[in-house]
């Protein structure tokens, strides 16, 4: 069992990026995956994550890979 909570972010736009920043503030958490169909949003969000992570453009692929313990849904 890991010592941190692994978060997946669904929606990498402005709200998703704010959630990434907030997870980064937590000692026992990190973002391990992000998902957004927009490549530009994925690229912007990727710059905020300092650890290893996976990025997806398809939500089914994200869920099937089971990269996270919890998901934050930040979509409109």
Predicted regions, residues:
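N-terminal Rossmann-like dinucleotide-binding module
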Residues: 1-50
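Beta-loop-alpha module in the N-terminal Rossmann-like domain of NAD(P)-dependent dehydrogenases
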Residues: 53-76
């Amino acid at each position: 069992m890991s010592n941190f909570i692994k978060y997946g972010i669904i929606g990498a736009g402005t709200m998703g990026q704010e959630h990434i920043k907030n997870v980064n503030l937590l000692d026992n958490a990190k973002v391990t995956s992000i998902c957004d169909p927009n490549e530009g949003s994925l690229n912007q969000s990727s710059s905020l994550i300092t650890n290893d992570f996976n990025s997806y453009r398809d939500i089914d692929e994200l869920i099937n890979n089971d990269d996270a313990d919890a998901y934050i849904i930040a979509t409109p």
